[in-house]
């Protein structure tokens, strides 16, 4: 039996596949989908309604990417009309918890961050 060659991950390396995965989970839509799916299993239309501003095309693309990475499980039922549900895999739950911590940190510190942005914007306009 052949042993699979383990990749040495280096997210700082431009050629490392880990960088692409980082992009998938840390993109706006990827991170929001992961955080929402921590709540429960959702149907496509429920996700679209829950995540304001996401287009159907972007939702479908992002779900497909997260499924290919092994973070999201897509379950299609053989019924009419079609019924498809999305949930997190164990690995998806693991990474989603980290993304949730990040989103909670952002919400907690939003006032300070926006104040910093205003100060920086004023400095730029004065120069």
Regions from the language model: what does each represent?
Residues 12-58, 85:
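N-terminal helix-turn-helix DNA-binding core of bacterial DNA-binding proteins
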Residues 48, 76, 99:
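Short, flexible helix/strand-to-coil boundary loops that buttress conserved ligand/catalytic motifs
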Residues 39, 80, 94:
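Glycine-/small-residue-rich active-site loops that bind phosphorylated ligands and cofactors
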Residues 1-14, 68, 73, 90, ...:
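C-terminal regulatory/oligomerization modules of transcriptional regulators
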Residues 59, 63-66:
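Basic amphipathic alpha-helical segments that dock to polyanions
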Residues 67-87:
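Beta-hairpin "wing" of winged helix-turn-helix
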